[in-house]
């Protein structure tokens, strides 16, 4: 059997492809949404599809193909995937919403204390906006999950080889 490319591990190869496709899709959609190429989306979190979900669901699928669904590795990866996807759609999404509220409040401070006072005391904080696009909607997680499963199945022969 030929080893994989990444650390001689075929599962890592396929999981990387699932992550890459999910992230590259975000770059492509930025062209249509913004009318320009935004390569930073390749390393950014949040948005459609969830690369976290595509990565862990591809991992689960790859392990199922390579070692079977009765293996300990499958049990570990499916629990891990559930935690990651729950976190992506729940906790990280909530943190992103909270960041949006905080950013909005910070923008309104000058209305209450005056612009001169704000610039005097808060100029550094003004520059450091909190990142709002952290998590995913349940639909983005679902699409990422489906993408990961499809990628794993498409590389079935490679994983078995």
For each feature predicted by the language model, list its residue ranges.
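Helix-loop-helix hairpins and the membrane-proximal interhelical loops
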Residues: 1-24, 32-35
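Membrane-embedded catalytic cores of phosphoryl/pyrophosphoryl-handling enzymes
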Residues: 23-25, 39-161
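Hydrophobic residues in alpha-helical segments
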Residues: 31-32, 64
């Amino acid at each position: 059997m030929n080893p994989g490319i990444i650390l001689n591990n075929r599962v890592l190869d396929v999981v990387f492809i699932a992550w890459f496709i999910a992230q590259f899709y975000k770059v492509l959609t930025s062209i249509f949404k913004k009318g320009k190429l935004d390569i930073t989306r390749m390393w950014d979190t949040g948005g459609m599809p969830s690369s976290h979900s595509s990565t862990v669901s591809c991992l689960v699928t790859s392990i199922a193909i390579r070692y079977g669904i009765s293996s300990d590795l499958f049990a570990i990866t499916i629990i891990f995937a559930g935690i990651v996807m729950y976190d992506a759609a729940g906790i990280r999404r909530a943190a992103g919403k909270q960041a949006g509220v905080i950013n909005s409040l910070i923008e309104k401070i000058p209305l209450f204390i005056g612009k001169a006072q704000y610039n005097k005391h808060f100029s550094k904080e003004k520059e450091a906006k909190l990142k709002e696009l952290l998590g995913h909607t349940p639909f983005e997680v679902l699409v990422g999950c489906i993408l990961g499963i499809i990628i794993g199945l498409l590389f079935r022969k490679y994983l078995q080889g």
